[in-house]
């Protein structure tokens, strides 16, 4: 049996990935595997710019709406799910198209996973209790002592990642920075061609981000977050689902911690920061094909042709 193949289409948020993926689907018999950690959640449609029902009816999409916002999803599970799906799609005589911008997942897929321990509910509860008693700053200072390298790259208010770094240290006796620095041996079980949309005009990308955020508001984003609060009372601002860009800012607005103009400003700024981080990852990622979606009028045609050549179609 021939080795399965997958074509990855990467890029920053609001960079045109979805539109291009649908163009490819008009030409080739593809199925889309979402590379987006926010799209896995049900009930989070507007703020994640989730593909519409008509778009999902036009071409099969995978790894969308697979868990509730109170459940968790991981890079390890993505690697497992994506690898399985590439094989299944290939067995149907169709082509796997991996589309998105969650670069941590893509790195895990292509470079392997570090040997980090699973989350420990008892230890996490103990850390949460310490945070309630002494404050997040206490946990951050503790992390600075046991793992200064990780503490240096985390923001002092990043509760989830500070807690996870301390959890790893207490479970293994080694700082997370040591684990992440350990080499991993990894071989993909399928052939992969990696293409990326990298816009050089940052102002144009920022404009797209602002326009899309305002469109989300018009579509009822605040109502969507209010519905999440009603359906899932256990959700908090620190829940992984609510840490998705835009949702954290909307949550704070609904908590009365900010006014509406400040919420909008913070939401747009956070989305721009996400795009900046994605572009930083992309520039460090080995790529087979790169195009600028804003300045290259033939980017769509060139990527479709690259996909055809790769799949032998």
From Swiss-Prot:
Molecular function GO terms recorded: ATP binding; tRNA dimethylallyltransferase activity
**InterPro entries, A to Z:** Dimethylallyltransferase, IPT, P-loop_NTPase
Region Interaction with substrate tRNA: what ranges? 36-39, 160-164, 243-248
The cofactors required by this protein are:
Mg(2+)
Q: Give the reaction(s) catalysed.
A: adenosine(37) in tRNA + dimethylallyl diphosphate = N(6)-dimethylallyladenosine(37) in tRNA + diphosphate
Q: Which UniProt keywords apply?
A: ATP-binding, Magnesium, Nucleotide-binding, Transferase, tRNA processing
Top-rank taxon of the source lineage equals Bacteria
| Residues annotated as site: Interaction with substrate tRNA | 102, 124
Positions binding substrate in this chain are 13-18
Subunit comment for this entry? Monomer.
Which family would the database say this protein is a member of?
Belongs to the IPP transferase family.
Report the protein name in the record: tRNA dimethylallyltransferase
């Amino acid at each position: 049996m021939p080795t399965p193949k997958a074509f990855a289409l990467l890029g920053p948020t609001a960079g045109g990935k979805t539109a291009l993926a649908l163009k490819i689907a008009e030409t080739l018999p593809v199925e889309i595997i979402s590379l987006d950690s926010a799209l896995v959640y049900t009930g989070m449609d507007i703020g994640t710019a989730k593909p519409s029902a008509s778009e999902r009816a036009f071409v099969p999409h995978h790894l969308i709406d697979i868990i509730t916002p109170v459940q968790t999803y991981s890079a390890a599970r993505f690697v497992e799910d994506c690898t399985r799906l590439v094989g299944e799609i290939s067995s149907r005589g169709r082509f796997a198209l991996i589309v998105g911008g969650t670069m941590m997942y893509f790195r895990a897929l292509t470079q392997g996973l570090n040997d980090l321990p699973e989350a420990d509910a008892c230890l996490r509860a103990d850390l949460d209790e310490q945070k309630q008693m002494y404050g997040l700053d206490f946990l951050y200072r503790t992390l600075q002592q046991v793992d200064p390298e990780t503490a240096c790259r985390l923001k002092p208010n990043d509760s989830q990642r500070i807690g996870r770094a301390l959890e790893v240290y207490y479970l293994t006796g080694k700082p997370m920075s040591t684990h992440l620095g350990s080499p991993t041996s990894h071989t993909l079980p399928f052939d992969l061609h990696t293409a990326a949309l990298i816009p050089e005009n940052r102002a144009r990308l920022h404009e797209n981000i602002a326009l899309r955020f305002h469109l989300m508001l018009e579509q009822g984003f605040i109502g969507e977050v209010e519905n999440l609060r009603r359906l899932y009372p256990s959700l908090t601002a620190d829940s992984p689902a609510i840490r998705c860009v835009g949702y954290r800012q909307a949550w704070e607005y609904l908590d009365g911690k900010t006014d509406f103009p400040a919420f909008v400003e913070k939401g747009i700024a956070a989305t721009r920061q996400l795009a900046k981080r994605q572009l930083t990852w992309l520039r460090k990622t080995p790529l087979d094909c790169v195009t600028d979606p804003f300045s290259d009028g033939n980017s769509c045609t060139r990527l479709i042709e690259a996909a055809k050549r790769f799949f032998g179609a």
